[in-house]
UniProtKB/Swiss-Prot annotation:
Matches recorded under Gene3D superfamilies: Glycoside hydrolase/deacetylase
Family, as annotated: Belongs to the LamB/PxpA family.
Catalytic activity: 5-oxo-L-proline + ATP + 2 H2O = L-glutamate + ADP + phosphate + H(+)
CDD domains the record matches: LamB_YcsF_YbgL_like
Highest taxon, organism lineage: Bacteria
GO MF, one example: 5-oxoprolinase (ATP-hydrolyzing) activity
Function of the molecule: Catalyzes the cleavage of 5-oxoproline to form L-glutamate coupled to the hydrolysis of ATP to ADP and inorganic phosphate.
EC number: 3.5.2.9
Protein name: 5-oxoprolinase subunit A
Amino acid sequence: MKIDLNADLGEGYASDAELLTLVSSANIACGFHAGDAQTMQACVREAIKNGVAIGAHPSFPDRENFGRSAMQLPPETAFAQTLYQIGALAAIARAQGGVMRHVKPHGMLYNQAAKEAQLADAIARAVYACDPALILVGLAGSELIRAGKQYGLTTREEVFADRGYQADGSLVPRSQPGALIEDEEQALAQTLEMVQHGRVKSITGEWATVTAQTVCLHGDGEHALAFARRLRATFAEKGIVVAA
């Protein structure tokens, strides 16, 4: 069994360099919620050095709230803003001898695109316009995955090690209790259940079906690196290969 392990990078956390030794894919902030041209270059350089797949992590234009504010943008605006961000990272990767492999939206752009078909379409269209060979990463079973498939893109369905799930397979909003799993044992058990058995127990006790093709590790948690190491070790014990 094989699984991709991804992390959001270039967001100002000191753990980036070490996380790049543990993950197989990096989602690099493109300036709209965090990061800038210099951090994008640095992250790309480190990803290439570690053999990690390079991806863009576009966001709503919301540096004040780290891309976590809901926005209602016209589809053409969402298309242009997404294309602008991923095009910049693609150029930076190419200039350093690398290749951008995937795109994963950030924060509320990701969450809204999981449910809003028009926004999902705008993002998928931007990814296709940039490079039809790119992989589009989205929440398992979401509108974004459906939109990507409609454009003929390769999609990758994502699950979260440290996020609570609702009965419909969506994430518990960060503003609600149960959104974040802080117990390491619970996060490990949830991840293995999703990867090995394709299901997750919701905060209300029901099982939801999920397709786990990539697991997100958050680099901003207090014990992010320790958990990443433990998850890698657990995957190795279970014969699960980590690869992009």
